């Protein structure tokens, strides 16, 4: 009899990635709308990715049982 495999949450699959050491990477938040109010340097700093802190990454890893 085969074991039931856990499913990965598809919303987490789209938004987060794991590094080789197990850290969780996501894109910077706050870039959808309202850019007129922000300074150019703030907009530039929000490009790219960021590493989640321990408490948030623990929650995200629960939804990615096999890592992606």
Swiss-Prot record:
Q: InterPro entries recorded for this chain?
A: Ribosomal_bL35, Ribosomal_bL35-like, Ribosomal_bL35_CS, Ribosomal_bL35_sf
A biological process (GO) annotation for this entry?
translation
Q: Which UniProt keywords apply?
A: Ribonucleoprotein, Ribosomal protein
Q: List cellular component terms (GO).
A: cytosolic large ribosomal subunit
- A single GO molecular function term of this UniProt record: structural constituent of ribosome
- What Pfam families does the entry give? Ribosomal_L35p
Q: Which family does it belong to?
A: Belongs to the bacterial ribosomal protein bL35 family.
Q: What is this protein called?
A: Large ribosomal subunit protein bL35
Source species of the chain: Wolbachia pipientis subsp. Culex pipiens (strain wPip)
Which lineage is the organism of this entry classified under, starting from the top rank? Bacteria, Pseudomonadati, Pseudomonadota, Alphaproteobacteria, Rickettsiales
């Amino acid at each position: 009899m085969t074991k039931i495999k856990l499913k990965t949450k598809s919303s987490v699959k789209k938004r987060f990635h794991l590094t080789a050491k197990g850290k969780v990477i996501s894109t910077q938040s706050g870039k959808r709308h309202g850019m007129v109010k922000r300074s150019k340097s703030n907009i530039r700093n929000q490009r790219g990715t960021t590493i989640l802190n321990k408490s948030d990454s623990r929650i995200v890893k629960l939804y990615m049982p096999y890592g992606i």
